[in-house]
A protein has these predicted regions:
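Beta-strand-rich N-terminal accessory domains
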Residues: 1-70, 149, 173, 297
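Extended, loop-rich substrate-binding clefts of extracytoplasmic carbohydrate-active enzymes
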Residues: 4, 70-152
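Acidic (Asp/Glu-rich), glycine- and aromatic
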Residues: 29-48, 149-200
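Beta-strand-rich recognition/accessory modules
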Residues: 234-305
Length: 305
């Protein structure tokens, strides 16, 4: 039986969730706005295993706008809600500050913990281009659950519903839809710690960096820590209803850094008509140890949606 997880809300800044038996702070959900150039948006960092090992990176020197686990939109109707340089076909990555937008925190509708060991963070956000116009409204639900000291794992379910508030379609794209080969990053994005470079990438039917741009129900990366002994595994899984929408493809790297994104617009733009809502739900499993394909499949099968 799970104990109630502990929540601390530093208003205007962040929400932290702590596992009471180990005393490990599992995550910090930061919603305080940061630098404009980095496309301010909420993010989760640090994200920790039950052993207390951090499995996210924050503002690495190669991409200052990579912040833990966050929802992004690298190409959105000509705007950049990713941060930093913007990809322009034929010219590469350019510093175009007037393209960089933001996802702004509006309010929390729920921040709660129950006796089953589940935490719910329900938030409303607004999406804006550089000039501050309202382009979209988002309802977001981050749930922490299945905290299991025996299997040394826990799970996070992230649901985002984005409603177009423009009078024209919102076009979700990526550097690949803009012309850069096999760089289709957008949507929910995880930047792993530096130690996870060269980590093992595992999918249901294959492994390694060649899983870039492929489709599948789940994808994982395991790496060996610096500092602490041992390994950790981070698993991303699609909710069943995601399959009915615009096709998703995995963005994944273990060189020059570790990253995963279940991209919603890898090869082709996704057009969201005015007033309509794009909903996606994902699960992120954070586990101590180097899980293999069979371990991951067994875990996911044992915890249906």
């Amino acid at each position: 039986v799970s104990e109630q997880l502990r929540i601390v809300h530093a208003h205007g800044d962040r929400i932290t969730v702590t596992e009471p038996v180990t005393g490990v702070e599992l995550l910090s959900y930061v919603y305080r706005a940061e630098a404009d150039w980095e496309a301010p948006k909420p993010y989760i960092h640090p994200l920790r295993t039950l052993a207390g090992d951090v499995v996210t990176d924050y503002r690495p020197n190669d991409h200052r706008w990579h912040k833990g686990l966050s929802l992004t939109a690298s190409h959105l109707s000509g705007a950049n809600l990713w941060g930093g340089n913007s990809y322009v076909h034929g010219e590469g990555y350019l510093a175009i500050p007037e393209r960089v937008g933001s996802m702004r925190h509006v309010a929390f509708d729920e921040v709660s913990a129950d006796d089953s060991g589940r935490v719910v963070i329900a938030e409303r956000l607004t999406w804006h281009p550089y000039d501050g116009e309202l382009w979209a409204e988002e309802t977001r639900r981050v749930e922490i659950h299945d905290v299991d000291l025996d299997s040394r794992s826990w799970a996070l379910t992230w649901t985002s519903a984005i409603t177009n508030r423009r009078t024209e379609p919102l076009l979700f794209g990526s550097p690949t839809t803009a012309g850069r080969d096999m760089a289709g990053y957008t949507g929910l994005f995880w930047r792993g710690p530096r130690a996870f470079r060269d980590g093992r990438i595992i999918g249901p039917d294959g492994e390694g960096p060649e899983l870039m741009g492929t489709q599948g129900e789940w994808l994982a990366l395991s790496g060996e820590h610096d500092g602490a002994d041992g390994f950790a595994t981070v698993v991303f899984a699609h909710a069943p209803e995601n399959a009915g929408g615009h096709p998703a493809h995995w963005f994944v790297r273990n060189e020059p850094f570790a990253a995963i994104a279940p991209s919603w617009a890898f090869f082709e733009e996704l057009a969201l008509p005015p007033g309509e809502t794009l909903t996606r739900r994902y699960r992120v499993v954070v586990a101590d140890g180097a899980w293999g394909r069979a371990d991951i499949a067994k875990y996911l099968e044992g915890r249906p949606w």
